[in-house]
């Protein structure tokens, strides 16, 4: 049966209940706003994780680089929350779109490069020509270093897109195989279902790891330019 032309724009539902309500409510449940500073163990764990992550990322930075602390923490929380929300049934993961990831990577990368040229002009220009380069290789190395500099935001975006997309495709394929094997072999279907559960747990870890890797690389680019 052919689907309606506007079926892709319809609000997803499961068992007659709209998934949109759960998706909208999930961030407030995950990060509740307590009436006092430390309300329960969940808030304590959240604050401990944020403090631990910020210390690891900002340990290599000087005073100027640490002014980006709020930006980096907001970035890792945004990407991590988006990746986790994308694992909900019938939901969409924005970080599987290269356009969105480039929209995050390019401004952040450009900000670090502009910061470097503004405050460390000579050091930033020195990156294009490693010390001790033979004279005949200077033009070629300048071109190579320039290309590698402009590839950095593309590498950030493609890495995040590829990892999240690959995980979702595997979940979709193994889930479809599980449903197809139910009527053929219950034992094989059960084994496939166990694999699906393990893969889903792995994807939760990947969702958080990719958020950390993306933010860590931005932090390293910032360190090179401050």
Swiss-Prot record:
The chain crosses the membrane at residues 11-31, 68-88, 97-117, 138-158, 164-184, 189-209. Keywords: ATP synthesis, CF(0), Hydrogen ion transport, Ion transport, Membrane, Mitochondrion, Mitochondrion inner membrane, Transmembrane, Transmembrane helix, Transport. It is a multi-pass membrane protein. The gene is MT-ATP6. Pfam families: ATP-synt_A. Coiled coil: none annotated. This is ATP synthase F(0) complex subunit a. It comes from Canis lupus. One of its GO terms (biological process) is proton motive force-driven ATP synthesis. Component of the ATP synthase complex composed at least of ATP5F1A/subunit alpha, ATP5F1B/subunit beta, ATP5MC1/subunit c (homooctomer), MT-ATP6/subunit a, MT-ATP8/subunit 8, ATP5ME/subunit e, ATP5MF/subunit f, ATP5MG/subunit g, ATP5MK/subunit k, ATP5MJ/subunit j, ATP5F1C/subunit gamma, ATP5F1D/subunit delta, ATP5F1E/subunit epsilon, ATP5PF/subunit F6, ATP5PB/subunit b, ATP5PD/subunit d, ATP5PO/subunit OSCP. Signal peptide: none annotated. CDD domains: ATP-synt_Fo_a_6. Belongs to the ATPase A chain family. It is found in: Mitochondrion inner membrane. GO terms for molecular function: proton channel activity; proton-transporting ATP synthase activity, rotational mechanism. One of its GO terms (cellular component) is proton-transporting ATP synthase complex. Subunit a, of the mitochondrial membrane ATP synthase complex (F(1)F(0) ATP synthase or Complex V) that produces ATP from ADP in the presence of a proton gradient across the membrane which is generated by electron transport complexes of the respiratory chain. ATP synthase complex consist of a soluble F(1) head domain - the catalytic core - and a membrane F(1) domain - the membrane proton channel. These two domains are linked by a central stalk rotating inside the F(1) region and a stationary peripheral stalk. It catalyses: H(+)(in) = H(+)(out).
């Amino acid at each position: 049966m052919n689907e309606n032309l506007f079926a892709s724009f319809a609000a997803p539902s499961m068992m007659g209940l709209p998934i949109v309500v759960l998706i909208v409510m999930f961030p407030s449940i995950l990060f509740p706003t307590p009436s006092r500073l430390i309300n329960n163990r969940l808030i304590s764990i959240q604050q401990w994780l944020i403090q631990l992550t910020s210390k690891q990322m900002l340990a290599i930075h000087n005073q100027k680089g640490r002014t980006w602390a709020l930006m980096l923490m907001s970035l890792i929380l945004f990407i991590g929350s988006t990746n986790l929300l994308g694992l909900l049934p019938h939901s969409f993961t924005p970080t599987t779109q290269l356009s969105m990831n480039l929209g995050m990577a390019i401004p952040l990368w450009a900000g670090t490069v502009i910061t470097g040229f503004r405050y460390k002009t000579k050091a930033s220009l020195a990156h294009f020509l490693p010390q001790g380069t033979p004279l005949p290789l200077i033009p070629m190395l300048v071109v190579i270093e320039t290309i590698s500099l402009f590839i950095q935001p593309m590498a950030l975006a493609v890495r995040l897109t590829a990892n999240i997309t690959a995980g979702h495709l595997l979940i979709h394929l193994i889930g479809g195989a599980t449903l197809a094997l139910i009527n053929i072999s219950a034992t094989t279907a059960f084994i496939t279902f166990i694999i699906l559960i393990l893969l889903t747990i792995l994807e939760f870890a990947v969702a958080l790891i990719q958020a950390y890797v993306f933010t860590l690389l931005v932090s390293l680019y910032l360190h090179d330019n401050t």
